[in-house]
């Protein structure tokens, strides 16, 4: 007796009732365990969330979404056998793989975000602790106009770091108040000046959140560790999970000796990006953001700069 076989219909390949292109079709919030190997160091293990998309032409009802999962898993297996790897390269490879699987698509996008644990030591006692940094990466792949086998790939890497800022404006008000009171007590002017130089005045503080992202072509690499350090240095002080009293003294004194507006933080990040990445091309896209969560206001303060690397170089060199 012959076995009956059935050809299952490919519903996704059928024509839609409304024939329009769709910019993005895919899956979001895909959880994956990612192990990134590093040269001469222990691997980084991340629990990551992926958003994966392709565009859809007007003559297809739907995309083959299972291919998105296949593309991600295939690249993750590749990562395990590669000596050194970067998360933006991971996204780039997934985007490239997606276009190979979705022959009807002209572009693919991959977004990844994760929490990255870094080790810290408190500034005075040296107590070891772990700090969480939010990291993210993106990649896009676009087919060439004349060659469907050529993919133009761009990738992005970035981080968000929490720190502390001290307000310069309120501090100057308190400095003037202290100088007046000391003068009324008969303290000599030169002694007042020396005192104010050594002892930082009170001001209100903010918890700052700095973000830097750098978008480059597929053949350039950007150090995530360098991005994190730049953001940390841009604020009045770093913050720590565990602090003893001597540590608290150092953190508070450091912050109040280095007061900064939200605008100062963005400009400091821009300056350090130019210094830290001299080999980046002029067409690299730099996005810098700073949000300060105010302590004496109900609102937050925000500043941002988006520019090409060449534009920043030109401005800072003037």
UniProtKB/Swiss-Prot annotation:
Give its E.C. classification number: 3.5.4.39
Q: Could you say which cofactors this protein requires? A: Fe(2+)
Q: Does the keyword Metal-binding apply?
A: yes
Which Pfam families is this protein grouped with? GCHY-1
Keyword set includes Cytoplasm: no
What family does this belong to?
Answer: Belongs to the GTP cyclohydrolase IV family.
Quaternary data: Homodimer.
Return the protein name.
GTP cyclohydrolase MptA
From the broadest rank down, the organism's phylogenetic lineage runs:
Archaea, Methanobacteriati, Methanobacteriota, Stenosarchaea group, Methanomicrobia
Protein encoded by which gene: mptA
